[in-house]
Amino acid sequence: IQDSDIVLLAVPTIAVEDTAKKVFEIVKNSIYVINVAKGFHPVTHDRLSVVIEKVADKEKCKGIISLIGPSHAEEVILRKLTCINAVSENEEAAKVIQHLFSNDYFRVYTNTDVIGAEIGVAIKNVMAIASGILEGSGQGDNARAALMTRGLAEMSRYGVSYGGKFETYLGLDGVGDLIVTCTSLHSRNFMAGFEIGKTQDVATFMKNNTKTVEGILACKVIHDEAQKRNISMPITDQVYAVLYEGKSPNQAISDLMKRDLKAEN
């Protein structure tokens, strides 16, 4: 990649920092860095564009762009119609990537709300685990619809508190990505939740899982940060209790349904 003008990072969240650092040590040219991982730094809790920015050689970085939106690679490779966002604070950089990737079956929009988009794409993975747990536990469409709707409320509440824009969560980076990740068998997060809900045995799943399930780490980061900021995240809290505190999935579902009654908004 030493002579590249554009470098795409397609690695797990925990590898983004080291990979980006090595990229800037190798490349000769000033480059656009594209990131497709979703989540937060496991220690600092930084968003991934911030992680990349901290290790970037400023003289070699033209822009950091995240590709975010409802997109499963299994469908893109088959040229199924897909729409996503090129997300960057540098709108011109986002437009470069927009035009590079757009074609007859893959349409790219731009979005400069990096905070909102990066937070949304991490939280939707947590909601996908929750959606899978519901499905694995034998719940139906009604429950999943409620989960996605209330999950969107958590997503926007958390993101706006950090400076994200509410309208971002009504677009591809919010409700769009939430729908596809919470309903698709292609989603590793959904399938992880499904297995946990079906077996009611999170310990065995965690021991045997060999796939990258970004929502597991994201859940811990979001839960911890929400606690510090006193942000109400009831679904996230229950997913955290299942993943990290040994709570049974069925008990978590029951506790959500037994919360104090209130107006929706």
Predicted features and spans:
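Generic structural signal for well-ordered, non-membrane alpha-helical segments
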Residues: 16, 41, 45, 49, ...
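Glycine-rich beta-alpha junction loops
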Residues: 38-40, 68-72, 88-90, 112-117, ...
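Internal alpha-helical scaffold of NAD(P)-dependent oxidoreductase catalytic cores
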Residues: 15, 26, 51-63, 81-168
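Rossmann-like NAD(P)(H) cofactor-binding subdomain of soluble oxidoreductases
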Residues: 2-79, 97
